Amino acid sequence: MSKRQDYIVAWMEVRGKRFEILVRPELAFRYKEKGDVDLEDVLWTDTIYRDVRKGLKASPEEVKKAFGTSDPRRVAEKILKEGEIQLTEEQRRRLLEAKRRQIISYIARNAIDPTTGRPIPEARIEAALEEVRFPINLWRDAESQAVEAVRLIARVMPIRLARALLEVKIPPPHSGRAYQALMRMGEVKKADWLPDGSLKAELEIPAGAQVEVTSRIQALARGAAEVKVKKVA
């Protein structure tokens, strides 16, 4: 068996009995949160244990009685989704910090200061989160927590989630490849091809991403694009 830090224990109690599996920390966390990784990559081994520390394996009979199946993959999937993941303090600290950064990044990209209509710097959002003592949940997705955080932060600073509608005009020769590029930046609400070959479009984006998206559009058009904020709501 590998060094202890290479794996962690995920466990679940069923009918008074504890069942454990060995998993890779980062992938197990991601699997539990998003389910977008292969179970094979998450599992260190497909053995089902009663007690990993003692090396005590669960018998197929007691596994089937507890889970209705003795298939280790199906059992492991249930443990990961419904059970607990036993993190070390360092792993928990690192994952909490990563989640905190995701929340801050989401707010910075999607929120504005309603008194100015401008994006809010991440440092200011971070300070506000600390001020309101927002409790970060390791197992919940960043987006839903960010929405809750904005409600709390609004008590100590002007902030709201918003969408911005940009009016964009891109002249030839850059207009030909512009439409697909704009679709990757946001939601194209309207697009028209002008007689001179220019593309005129309305692009909806997260309000906090105005500077970033405008910069990307100008890079696409070699600085020749016209970008105006039509509405922030």
From Swiss-Prot:
PROSITE patterns, sorted: UPF0023 (PS01267)
InterPro entries: EFG_III/V (IPR035647), Ribosome_mat_SBDS_CS (IPR018023), Ribosome_mat_SBDS_N_sf (IPR036786), Sdo1/SBDS (IPR002140), Sdo1/SBDS-like (IPR039100), SDO1/SBDS_C (IPR046928), SDO1/SBDS_central (IPR018978), Sdo1/SBDS_central_sf (IPR037188)
GO biological process: cytosolic ribosome assembly
Similarity field: Belongs to the SDO1/SBDS family.
Alphabetized NCBIfam families for the sequence: RNA_SBDS
Protein name stated in the entry: Ribosome maturation protein SDO1 homolog
